[in-house]
Regions:
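Receiver (REC) domain active-site loop signature in two-component systems and cognate sites
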Residues: 57
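Active-site residues of response regulator receiver
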Residues: 7, 54
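Alpha4 helix (beta4-alpha4-beta5 surface) of REC/receiver domains from two-component response regulators
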Residues: 64, 85-100
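Interdomain helical linkers/hinges and coiled-coil/dimerization scaffolds
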Residues: 94, 100, 106-139
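Acidic, metal-coordinating helix/loop segments flanking the phosphotransfer/catalytic sites
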Residues: 32-50
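Two-component/phosphorelay signaling modules centered on CheY-like receiver
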Residues: 10-31
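Short amphipathic alpha-helix used as the core "switch/output" element in two-component signaling
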Residues: 41, 63-74
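Acidic catalytic/metal-coordinating carboxylates
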Residues: 35, 61-64, 82
């Protein structure tokens, strides 16, 4: 399982990496991106299954990244991270289909819970595709 952490602040990317509880979840590879453009390159080249992205970033924000992922990397599971606690903003982000919306400063249990949920969703999706290919489920 591969993880991409996208945030314009190095300290936040580093904190997320260090908050991951290896007892609960482990990743084979963890990639970092400082902005939208770097994130797109990582997604194209490495196909991470789980993506944690900040919402407020310079130039292109996390919403733009989420919309790109929904179009070009549909199986990736996204967790949004932000200091924005405006209800309509959170609701708009969740409606895009992200796994969770976490507020900064991050809570270790919330982060690990969201990561576990994202991995579970990804695995369920892959199992569905496998069963569909075998003809065991219909659309």
């Amino acid at each position: 399982m591969k993880l991409l952490i996208t945030d314009d602040e190095y300290a936040t990317r580093s904190a997320i990496k260090h908050l991951i509880d290896p007892e609960k979840i482990s990743f084979d590879e963890i990639f970092e991106a400082e902005n939208y453009e770097e994130a797109i390159k990582v997604i194209i080249n490495h196909r991470p299954q789980i993506i944690v992205t900040d919402i407020v970033m310079p130039v292109h924000n996390g919403i733009t990244l989420i919309d790109w992922i929904l179009q070009f990397s549909k199986d990736s599971q996204v967790i949004a991270v932000s200091g924005h606690d405006n209800f309509s903003f959170i609701k708009s982000t969740l409606r895009r289909g992200v796994v969770d919306y976490l507020l900064k400063p991050l809570d270790i249990d919330e982060l690990n819970g969201a990561l576990q949920k994202a991995v579970s969703r990804y695995e369920q999706r892959m199992e569905y595709y496998k069963l569909k290919k075998a003809g065991e489920v219909s659309e």
